[in-house]
């Protein structure tokens, strides 16, 4: 059962953006892509490990449109499967060239610990009445961006990049990750439900998102109280709750401000690519992939 649950988790789909970014960063500096495959698999297995444990902490019954491992087999199996996936990630990582292993392990370990720090911040925010934009951006940098940053850094290291180029790619991925998460926040409330993703889940769960935090910072006290309590109003349907909160967002110009921040972070990311020592033609694929992520509709 242990390996069948791991297989179930890995077969669940997803964007595979972390291994893609690792391979694309690697490809900026070399065409010998086979050397990066074990590390690419490692970051994807690690990411899925975090999702297994996230679902336990969030009491989440669904993951990628299917019952979560936690819901299907229970918390004990989900914990054990996640632990095994973490070990599998390290085993895959051990296949990188021996001379690079200490640097890559150091990068991976720092990344993994920062992801845990980000998850703790996210849980702390659930019981915190007021969260600032600065605090939120720091949390999503740890929870989302650093895994992208670790992935591109490891890929670049394996490709023979200089330390300076590795640092630049890390910063590129931090900015891209921030743009990606802010867009996730925006799409949860303003995405197209015809594309198969439910709209308004963050509002109904009372999650601290960039939209909610920005609205709270711009609202008067009566409006802040409405933002806090609308989702709890038993007289309203879920659709009415979502519509009521979105009307406040619209009145406070929150969607435009969020889009502005997404564009700012994304443009910063692309500008960093232009400073790499590699020929611009070799950065084209990672640039196009980044553009596809920020241009998505769900």
Go through each PLM region and give its residues.
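All-alpha prenyltransferase/terpene-synthase fold signal
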Residues: 1-298
């Amino acid at each position: 059962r242990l390996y069948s649950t791991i297989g179930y988790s890995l077969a669940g789909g997803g964007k595979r953006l972390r291994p893609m970014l690792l391979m694309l960063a690697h490809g900026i500096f070399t065409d010998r892509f086979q050397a990066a495959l074990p590390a690419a698999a490692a970051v994807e297995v690690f990411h899925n490990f975090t999702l297994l444990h996230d679902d336990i902490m969030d009491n989440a019954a669904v993951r990628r449109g299917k019952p979560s491992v936690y819901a299907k087999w229970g918390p004990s199996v989900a914990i054990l499967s996640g632990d095994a996936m973490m070990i599998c990630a390290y085993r895959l990582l051990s296949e990188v060239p021996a001379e690079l292993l200490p640097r890559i392990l150091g990068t991976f370990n720092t990344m993994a610990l920062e992801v845990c720090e980000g998850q703790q911040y996210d849980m702390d925010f659930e019981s915190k009445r007021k969260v600032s934009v600065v605090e939120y951006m720091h949390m999503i940098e740890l929870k989302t961006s650093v895994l992208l940053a670790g992935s591109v850094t490891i890929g670049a290291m394996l490709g023979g990049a200089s330390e300076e180029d590795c640092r630049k790619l890390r910063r590129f991925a931090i900015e891209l990750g921030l743009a990606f998460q802010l867009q996730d926040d925006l799409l949860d409330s303003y995405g197209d439900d015809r594309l198969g993703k439910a709209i308004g889940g963050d509002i109904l769960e009372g999650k601290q998102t960039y939209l909610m935090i920005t609205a709270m910072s711009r609202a008067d006290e009566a409006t802040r109280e409405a933002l806090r309590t609308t989702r709890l109003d038993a007289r309203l349907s879920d659709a009415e709750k979502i519509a009521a909160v979105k009307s406040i967002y619209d009145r406070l110009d929150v969607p435009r401000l969020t889009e502005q921040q997404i564009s700012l972070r994304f443009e910063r990311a692309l500008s960093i690519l232009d400073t790499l020592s590699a020929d611009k033609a070799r950065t084209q694929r990672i640039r196009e992939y980044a553009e596809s992520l920020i241009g998505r509709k769900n």
